[in-house]
Amino acid sequence: MQLSLKFVAGLVLASSAAFAAEDNVEINLQRRNSFFSTGNQLNVNAFTTHQSQVNNKYKDALENFKRNMGRDHPLLRLLLGDKRNNGGSGTVKLTDVQQEQLWAGDVSFGGQTFGIDFDTGSSDTLVNPKAYDPKKSKNSKNTHDYFRAAYGDGTTAKGFIYTDDFEIAGLKAKNVAIGHSVSEFIQDQEPSQGIAGLAFPSIQSFPKKYTPFFEALKKQKAVNSGVFQFTLKPGKGSTLVLGKVDSSKYKGKVTYVDVDPSQGFWLTDAKINGQKIKAIIDSGSTIITGPTDQVRSMVKGLKGMTPFSSGGTLMYTYDCKNTPNVSINIGGTDFKLSKSQLFFGHANNGQCVFPVAGQDGLPMEAWIVGDTFFQAVSIIFDTDKNRMGFATQA
């Protein structure tokens, strides 16, 4: 399945940014494949691989935080090497097809254009070896700084950091850092050939002297302001706005909450069905994932939930005729998830899969709030005022 996702960029019109394109530049993005086969049956292998990737991403992020900040992250839950498997309480067979799902769009380094996933849960820009050839760019520079980042089931991105000219939606910046992996860490996942991080620098694996790509755009005044806004939809009309807030994407008021950039993540206090949680807002994760014990506690309040486990992930199914009630409260505002947002495909017994999961070995005391929630709200990420804004989609 392909889905058009457009970038709308708020551009600087001053002469100092003469290279900037006109306002309302748009790029078509694709929703990278799907976790579902015909009949909306969930692909268990693709999904558990994705969950493993998320787990490894956060383990790396906490290690990066300690190296960059000289202390453990306040959310640290487990020893990073601990891969305990507490299991689930049953098994439901799921159909295995070969598809996956993330949001991807085009960027350009050194005049070379390739697809990349936009991830508010990480900070570095990493690409596969064939996506970018530094030798083809007249302004590329090998810094000889080495990087290494775990990505999935034993898959690792590793290589050297280059700096080069960067462009996205007509917005340009010079000397932006890109990790050119010598090994393929994203396999068979066109159109994406890399990851572009939108979290804060304190969790980046690159040395501190390199800033994430959006910070580079901001420092070089390629954007009017340090804000970006995700509005993701299951059909057409999904957007990522850079450099401004587009009020046409939401209705009603925007609820703002403060964010501490020193912690690296887009992190806020929240409640899910009244249960207090720490929530990391992560565009690079598909569902809502929490520590297994906390997820079990939340699900106890729902009727008709059948647990199953796969690959260290505890999930649930429910009768499709009786969708559970789930709402997430942020900043005192309840955002109720709709029937379609709570549908994550079918198990082969005909029941619906619930898009809230417990993850064994999750290295921190926080929930990862992904695409399931993104499709209910328009989210404003404000690096100028260190805050996030949430509003119901228009």
Language-model features: locations:
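Non-catalytic N-lobe/flap surface of aspartyl protease domains
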Residues: 21-250, 296-329, 351-369, 393-394
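Generic recognition of flexible, low-complexity loop/linker segments
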Residues: 275-278, 314-316, 377
